[in-house]
A protein has these predicted regions:
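Positively charged n-region of N-terminal signal peptides that target proteins for export
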Residues: 1-4
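Bacterial signal peptide processing site
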Residues: 17-23
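Extracytoplasmic c-type cytochrome modules immediately beyond a signal peptide or single-pass transmembrane anchor
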Residues: 23-156, 166-209
Length: 209
């Protein structure tokens, strides 16, 4: 039972920054941003873009698995509040490692940031103004591919992101210490928490030379 509880909390902590991927509607139309990036519907992706999409999702899954494993270890040895420190100090390093291994840029962002360093990349800024609730895909003339994957809050995530009065005192104190300007509270189950973003380069086979 203890192992199950630890794994449950670890998944809960990660799912507060994880994502559920939703398909875009068939009516989604292609549009261009000022930076050259174009929104593109999933059902119009060419074979190369479909491969890039799979790489983006695989990178997100790899980050999920690695951080979940680390959080489970911390919860077992140090308790739930210690997971807050891991999210601050180790999650960025883990994301960088996954990005290097998968040859992508990957990160997390939100319109209500907990960590002010989780700002969106330039190509995502204008798209996020509309707070997309479905997965969004973009392409660039130079062959790059990008994805924004929404984060839906699960019930167990309320331990760290719910109304302030419902957050356990030790977790609340850890949040105050680590994130004095925290804005990521007051959520309810099912709320849009934020987004994973992934940028995939042009496949090597298509690079000029």
């Amino acid at each position: 039972m203890r192992v199950l509880a630890i794994m449950f909390f670890a998944v809960a902590v990660f799912n507060c920054v994880g994502c559920s991927i939703e398909k875009p509607t068939a009516s989604q139309q292609e549009s261009k941003s000022s930076s050259g990036w174009s929104l593109v519907a999933e059902d119009t992706l060419n074979p190369t873009q479909q491969l890039q999409q799979k790489i983006a999702v695989a990178a997100r899954e790899a980050l999920f698995e690695r951080l979940m494993k680390r959080l489970a270890a911390v919860v077992e040895t140090e308790g739930p509040a210690a997971a807050i420190a891991v999210c601050q100090s180790e999650a960025p390093t883990i994301a960088q490692a996954v990005g290097h291994e998968k040859n992508v840029r990957i990160g997390r962002t939100s319109d209500k940031l907990r960590n002010s360093k989780n700002q969106p990349p330039e190509w995502a800024v204008s798209v996020l103004k509309d707070r997309p609730t479905q997965a969004v895909f973009l392409t660039h003339p130079d062959g790059r591919f990008a994805a924004l994957l929404p984060v839906r809050l699960k019930a167990q995530c309320l331990t760290c992101h719910g109304p302030i009065e419902s957050i356990p005192m030790d977790v609340r104190q850890a949040l105050l210490q680590r994130y004095p300007e925290d804005r990521a509270i007051g959520y309810a189950e099912g709320d849009l928490r934020g987004w994973f973003w992934v940028e995939v380069p042009k496949p090597p086979a298509e690079t000029g030379g």
